[in-house]
Design a protein with these regions (language model features):
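PLP-dependent amino-acid enzyme catalytic core
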Residues: 1-265
């Protein structure tokens, strides 16, 4: 018997529709307790802050978020007894706000993009004495994926060779941490970043849009190790949303916009 839901972090690697002579597999991160890959850095960032003495019982946590990191922090905060305040741009989904509140978090909605949410979180950190975990630059974020996601992939592929890793980019944690672990095992692995066509900072394209849920923050996060990347692909939102439907209808796992984008890439 586990002590709490945090012991349930982890996800299966599942074969999906693939071209002939090729195996494509997806990490079904919705199987994490909070429903996404962001449960991993949420736990690691909080526990790193505790270990460093930066977060103590009675402290409040504040973080800007487009959704899933906030849900993960709200869940981990509920387990550990922290008050969590999350600042989210108005354009992000109402359903994510509802989940954050269901875990007991305070949700503050701001006009603008994630940069506006970061400014408000900075203000709350200064004025209310809250602890901000700073997911875009906190090394515990990619470390969580190096120690968990990457390790799981290596165990799950068995004696197969991994030729490529494809992942959406937001904070840079998933692709950096997982990519580093896979590169150690497979030096020739190709690591492909996926970003919105309307927020293509890596590809040098348009940066005017913020419609995607969960990726494309509009800047290159300090946590993103660009030296790992072999390529960056852009995907239009309508195409990503259309790509979400076949996996749920034909293979079972429901996926969101960023997964649809990665599948297209």
């Amino acid at each position: 018997m586990d002590d709490n839901v945090l012991a349930g972090l982890g996800s299966p690697l599942v074969r999906v529709s693939s071209p002939p002579e090729t195996t494509v597999a997806a990490k079904v991160e919705s199987r994490n307790p909070g429903g996404s890959a962001k449960d991993r850095p949420a736990r690691w960032m909080i526990e790193a802050a505790e270990a460093a003495g930066d977060l103590e019982p009675g402290d409040g946590i504040v973080e800007p978020t487009s959704g899933n990191t906030g849900i993960g922090l709200a869940m981990v905060g509920a387990v550990k007894g922290y008050d969590v305040t999350l600042v989210i741009p108005a354009g992000k989904s109402v359903e994510r706000r509802q989940l954050m509140r269901a875990y007991g978090a305070t949700v503050e909605v701001v006009d603008g993009d994630i940069a506006a949410a970061k400014d408000r979180a900075d203000q709350l950190e200064r004025e209310a004495g809250m602890v901000q975990l700073r997911q875009f630059e906190n090394p515990a974020n990619p470390r969580s994926h190096y120690e968990t996601t990457g390790v799981e992939v290596l165990e799950q592929v068995g004696d197969r060779r991994v030729d490529a890793l494809v992942a959406g980019v937001g904070t840079g944690g998933t692709i950096t941490g997982t990519g580093r672990r896979l590169r150690e095992a497979f030096p020739e692995v190709r690591i492909v970043a996926v970003e919105p066509a309307t927020n293509a900072v890596l590809s040098g394209g348009d940066t005017t849009g913020d419609e995607f849920q969960g990726m494309g923050p509009g800047f290159v996060a300090p946590n993103l190790d660009e030296s790992l990347l072999g390529d960056a692909r852009t995907v239009e939102l309508p195409a990503a949303e259309a790509e979400c439907r076949p996996p749920a209808r034909e293979e079972g796992p429901p996926v969101g916009q960023s997964s649809g984008a990665s599948s297209l890439a």
